[in-house]
Amino acid sequence: MVADGAIENYAVAGAIGAIFYVEPFSTEDLDVFVVTPEDRLIIELPGWDYLKAHGYTRIEKEGIVVEGWPVQFVPATTPLEREAYLNAQIVSVDEVSVRVVLPEHLVAIMLNVGRPKDIARIKMFLSQDAVKLTALEDVINRHGLSEEWSNYKRTFLK
């Protein structure tokens, strides 16, 4: 889609993004950060016309089904999401380059969202040494998540 100009760029996030750094776990969809024009009241999904033209028209839950996977194209709207999108690293998967959100940004996003499954995944990242703590704390401090991080450490890192 990027090569064909359908979207400017992307960054794999969410559970699939996490699987690039920690042991695999079950997930039902693929989250992909994209950028959208900021001045629009209604956001048109980048690449939707491209996907339709290539036969991907089925919607399942919140995602467009692509090769059997519901894919959620998530606009990177918060400063944390935009930073994660802009700083994604390129990883090779079966000789295909894939942009993936850095582990420190994934953990900060999980900390911010705070669902039970996110909290459990943070523990996976920490226990498997999948994040650099100094870099993580820099991201956390930059995005105003210091209180959430302190609460997490007090509760789960005894």
Question: Where are each of the predicted segments found?
Answer:
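Compositionally biased terminal segments of proteins
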Residues: M1-K158
